[in-house]
């Protein structure tokens, strides 16, 4: 098993880190620059910054927010939310951002994945997939891709889409369960495992981490290459060192 990454996520709205449940009911957590500095000190492997209202509001990523964080991070840094073009990615990479996380734009225009991978290298292109479970008989895939912060159905099967983004040149997948997001009830292990077993690129588990055991389950049962969390880190319930120590003691290789 390769080293597993532990990744905090900054969901940013109006210049503040926020966290909600099922992508709604947001509450203020902290300043994004302060949070980023703290996670760098604690030994996070990467940092993800999501402008969570960009796509919903049909606008680009707020570059001024990204720039403040990019100027001080000392670890790999991915940005998502409102990235819709090669020009957007060029601007982010010029600021020092390491990876672009693209979601709604590539569901609507899958060719953007291969275009971006060819120009920047697949290792810089993350495709974020938001998924939900549908009831049997709904006429929709059981595991379905949703977009616009989970507000819009696509009718796409999540495993089929994951394979498509891999074949198009994505370097990794950031998989978030809309149903589990913010609940602290654990990752959607069925969804995570289904995607991780369908592709050969790394898959990051996201949405629902509430305990140290959930992080472990994401790797062992979900087959994830990285575990992402927000609430538990932002509100001090678990620290990055505590998470890594727990995983290491359970036999999971991590960077200590």
Residue ranges, per PLM feature:
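Conserved, mostly hydrophobic/aromatic
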Residues: 11, 39, 47, 92, ...
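Structural preference for beta-strand elements that scaffold enzyme active sites
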Residues: 5-9, 46, 74-78, 98-101, ...
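Glycine-rich, proline-tolerant flexible connector loops at the mouths of alpha/beta enzymes
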Residues: 46-65, 104, 174-186
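Charged helix-capping and loop-helix junction motifs
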Residues: 60-67, 110, 155-159, 185-194
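Conserved anion-binding
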Residues: 12-14, 18-19, 97-175, 179-180, ...
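Glycine/small-residue-rich loop that forms an oxyanion/phosphate-binding "nest" at active or ligand-binding sites
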Residues: 53, 62-120
